[in-house]
Structures are given as structure tokens and as C-alpha cells.
């Protein structure tokens, strides 16, 4: 099943000029995913048109990489989310997660504690993309900002204390992780990444 999913899914990865992007590229290639990488300096409309063209041949997913700064500073990413929302599934990691929350009207604020290469035990719902994973789950955190005033449209799937660590919008097929599944500090990160892509593309396959 995983092999079939990989062969039928093409990932469009937006690189927010972050070193973790290369970890994601390696993970996706190991999974056998089709992959196209764009820097966030590329026109959002150009990326969206490429996704529409690819969707005629395979399932398509948008992956938003980690990166420095705030979502508003991340080039085409905020505008691209609005173009893709409800059309193609989206997975956002760290900065990408924050951009998803902001796109639905949530706030991004400075976190009380800056996390840089720290591991935290998050609690999760134990189903969907978190199925068959440890509870709590050790994850890697690299962030000084966090989501706040969570919009009603988003469901919090995992958290650490009061910090939302995973959110989703089921109808729009949007999923965000504040942590880094591609880091070696995250337990079962490869499994989580694959189950997340599986979850996001499941409905698309049935369309």
C-alpha cells in the first residue's frame, strides 16, 4: 500500500530557505515520492499552475518547509496557501504550520520559551496520522514563535502544555506540525510523515 501511495503521489515542496528542507527531500525520495522543489521566491501562481497540470497524472500535495522569521516574511507561501486551500492537500512544518494557522485567522506570537534543537513529549489523539505511534511522542522543536487564538475551523490534534503542536482542517485537507518530523530527534518521524501524506491524499484518491 505504501509503495502504491508513493508512486501515485507528487509532492510540491516550498523551500523557505531552511537547512531542514534537505532532510525533507531525502525523506521523500526514500519513500519514492515524485518531488518538485520551489524556493519561496517563485510566483505562487506559477507553482499553482504546475500543481494543476501535475494533478492530471497523479495525486498532488503541497509541503511547506520550515524556515526563519514569520509567515508573512516567507515570500509566496501565504498567497500560495490561499490559492491551494480546498483544492489540494497541504502539509506545513514549523513555519509552514504557522502559516496555515494564520491563513485561517489565528495569531502567531512569540513563545514564552525559545526551543532550538530540543525534544518535547507531545500528547496526541492516537488516530489518523498518529496511529500506532508512542503516547506521548518525543518530537524535535526549533521555534521561537507559536500559534495562538486558534481559529474554530482548525482542530488541535497534538499539544505540549498550551502550545498547539499539530492542527488540521479536515475538509480543506490542511495539516500543520509545529515540530519537525524529519529530525532524528522525532521518534518514528518517517512513519509519521508517511501516515500524514496517506491521510491527506486518502480523500483525493476517492474523488
Where are these regions (language model features)?
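Short loop/edge segments at beta-strand edges and connector loops
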Residues: 39-40, 110, 141, 158
